[in-house]
């Protein structure tokens, strides 16, 4: 891997057994992501984009090949070490926010910090500052059910960034939002990526969002190619 890479994979493949047959989803995927770089992955539904993102984030195991995150080869780590690395170096944003419904916006954003054993007072301060930055300083004590769809996604973005990760993986981050709200979320993500120098890897069907990235890659027949 490139020593400067935030994320790298080599010859990454994934297949599933369906009865007596083996279905190849990904084949020989190669990717290198540099600090502060923003990359979009596009492709048809069912092409394996989410599967690839899960393997790059250490949430799924490849059938072959290797993934390096922040200089660590994921396959060389045990489950506990992988979890700690994910919490430290990665943020995740999904199409659905996956906020914990019983906790407030502030408490949801605090979670990655508390998992990393940040003192509670510091965690709350950092979470509040980031929620202010995403325009939700007045909604700290609101639970997800009391927030709009766009507000929930802003909380999810704040949660992904609160640990100051090197990389954020985003799976259709605007896919569940109306066009106006999606535009606001898109502008917020780009501003935060630039100002925090955080790398973004975005899986999306939104070609407008993809067009704002530094590079666009297409997943086609199990391989990544330049779009």
From Swiss-Prot:
It is found in: Cell inner membrane. SUPFAM superfamilies: P-loop containing nucleoside triphosphate hydrolases. NCBIfam families: LolD_lipo_ex. ATP binds at residues 43-50. One of its GO terms (cellular component) is plasma membrane. GO terms for molecular function: ATP binding; ATP hydrolysis activity; transmembrane transporter activity. The lineage of its organism: Bacteria, Pseudomonadati, Pseudomonadota, Gammaproteobacteria, Pseudomonadales. The complex is composed of two ATP-binding proteins (LolD) and two transmembrane proteins (LolC and LolE). Its main location: membrane. Belongs to the ABC transporter superfamily. Lipoprotein translocase (TC 3.A.1.125) family. The gene is lolD. This is Lipoprotein-releasing system ATP-binding protein LolD. Part of the ABC transporter complex LolCDE involved in the translocation of mature outer membrane-directed lipoproteins, from the inner membrane to the periplasmic chaperone, LolA. Responsible for the formation of the LolA-lipoprotein complex in an ATP-dependent manner. Residues 7-227 form the ABC transporter domain. Keywords: ATP-binding, Cell inner membrane, Cell membrane, Membrane, Nucleotide-binding, Translocase, Transport. Its EC number is 7.6.2.-. It is an enzyme of class 7 (translocase). GO terms for biological process: lipoprotein localization to outer membrane; protein localization to outer membrane; transmembrane transport. It comes from the Bacteria. InterPro entries: AAA+_ATPase, ABC_transporter-like_ATP-bd, ABC_transporter-like_CS, ABC_transpr_LolD-like, LolD_lipo_ATP-bd, MacB-like_ATP-bd, P-loop_NTPase. It is a peripheral membrane protein.
């Amino acid at each position: 891997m490139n020593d400067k890479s935030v994320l790298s994979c080599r010859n990454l493949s994934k297949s599933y057994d369906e009865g007596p047959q083996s279905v190849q989803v990904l084949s020989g995927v190669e990717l290198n992501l540099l600090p502060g770089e923003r990359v979009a992955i596009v492709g048809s539904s069912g092409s394996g984009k989410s599967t690839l993102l899960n393997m790059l984030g250490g949430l799924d195991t490849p059938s072959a090949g290797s993934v390096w995150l922040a200089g660590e080869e994921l396959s060389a780590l045990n489950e506990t070490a992988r979890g700690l690395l994910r919490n430290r170096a990665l943020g995740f944003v999904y199409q659905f926010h996956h906020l914990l419904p019983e906790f407030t916006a502030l408490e949801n954003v605090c979670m990655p910090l508390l998992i990393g054993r940040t003192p509670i007072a510091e965690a709350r301060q950092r979470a509040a500052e980031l929620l202010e930055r995403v325009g939700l300083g007045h909604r700290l004590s609101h639970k997800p059910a009391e927030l709009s769809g766009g507000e929930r996604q802003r909380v999810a973005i704040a949660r992904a960034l609160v640990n100051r990760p090197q990389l954020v993986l985003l799976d259709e981050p605007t896919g569940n939002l109306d066009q106006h709200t999606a535009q606001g979320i898109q502008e917020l993500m780009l501003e935060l990526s630039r100002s925090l120098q955080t790398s973004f890897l975005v899986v999306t069907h939104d070609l407008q969002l993809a067009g704002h990235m530094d590079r666009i890659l297409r997943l086609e027949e199990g391989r990544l190619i330049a779009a």
